[in-house]
Amino acid sequence: MTSEVGNPHLMVEVEDVETFDLDTFAVTARELDIFSNGINIEIFSVVERKFINARVNERGVGETDACGSGALALFTYLREINEVDDQAIVLYPGGELELSYEKDKLFLKGKVTYL
């Protein structure tokens, strides 16, 4: 599934987020003509209706610890297909991002850390 939330994201559900070879997959996916301008790649698994394990490989950067736009893309997609409720937490290697949908608005909350 792809989503546009200010920047493009390819979202792929996998069985084991931690062991999936994201770097190799990202190189292969970005070679496709449909992604000629680059794309951020999210791999994920829904743990429960409230928790989503995820990792991200951002175009031009590589794998990062977390991604706000990626979390929004995942949340909106999974909410649309009724896999999560109106509140969910995306669990990235770098920390948790809390997402909610209230009165036709999306909210994203998380800790900011400078690296």
Task: List the predicted regions and their residue ranges.
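Active-site proximal loop and beta-alpha junction motif in alpha/beta enzyme cores
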Residues: 1-66, 73-115
